[in-house]
Amino acid sequence: MRTRPFFGARLEDRLKKVINRVLKRRGWQESVRPYTGYGTSEQIRVLARIVLQPSKQFGIVQAANALLYRRGWRNFIGFSKADAAASIRIGNTTVPVRADRGGYIDVRIKNPGLAPGWHSVTIQGSDGASAVASVQIIGDDITFGVVSDIDDTILSTWLPRPFLAAWNSFVLTEQARQAIPGMARWYQQMLEANPGSPLIFVSTGAFNTYPMIRRFQKRHGIPHGAMLLTDWGPTNTGWFRSGTDHKRTALRELARDLPNIRWLLVGDDGQHDPELYAEFAELQPAHVLARAIRELSPGEAVLAHGIRLEDGEHRWNPTTAPEFRAPDGDGLADKLRKLDIISF
């Protein structure tokens, strides 16, 4: 049985060590990138990343242009600082932690007494850099929550087409990205009618795109929530990460961390969301309220997988949680109302 990490991961680790030394000599400085987390009365999941970034400051005009016309490639500036030491401060409690080989911090810490609601935690790097992350503490009495995909569910990317995926990720300005109609309004209505319920985004997108996604959500009125994204590059078992496995693991962790909640799973029919959600509903029936699938347009569907199964006669569905489909948020909201399983 092989115990050594995959060759690609070992090669990447060696290259990172060399590049880290070079970048430090060139004046690059440590930076902490915080991500939104979640927690309960017992534990808090804190997410962040330690990276090296150029220390050069832009002029006023350049900074304004960068702010107003951010392009995707700007989200990828920075180089991970592997195994970096850090600490997390929650109230009067400070906990030492260490980043993984990708510079990521993903830890669960005992809740020192934070009440349900939104709170701030501070992540401090070993070289003095720090950042504040938001965490939502979810009350023990909360029984409803929403899990949402991002690409082609709230944000139109035409992601499965390789050229457009690269264009959207690295070139397209953030202001040019399109929101799926009605999704923000639907999410707002559900969370307003069910105060304290979490909205958690689970996506195969890279954590590098987190700042862009947050700005997009704010601009289009999409409620704030934890984002469980992934990383690009080799793993300890292969050259590429499995997006399907990432989502499957994220759903299992949510069921474990928030056992009282039954989830409305929201995704699209462009890739694997219907199958993943059906599998989760079958294996964890106590944790799934319903499954909402946004139907891609014919053009999007062809780019996603070439064909589209229009009728449900041959589509398998678990009987434990209803599934409904519509092309936008307003249509999905109407169908959920007809099911009469939650109020909003």
For each predicted feature, which ranges?
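Residue-level marker of positions within ordered structural domains that often coincide
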Residues: 53, 157, 188, 256, ...
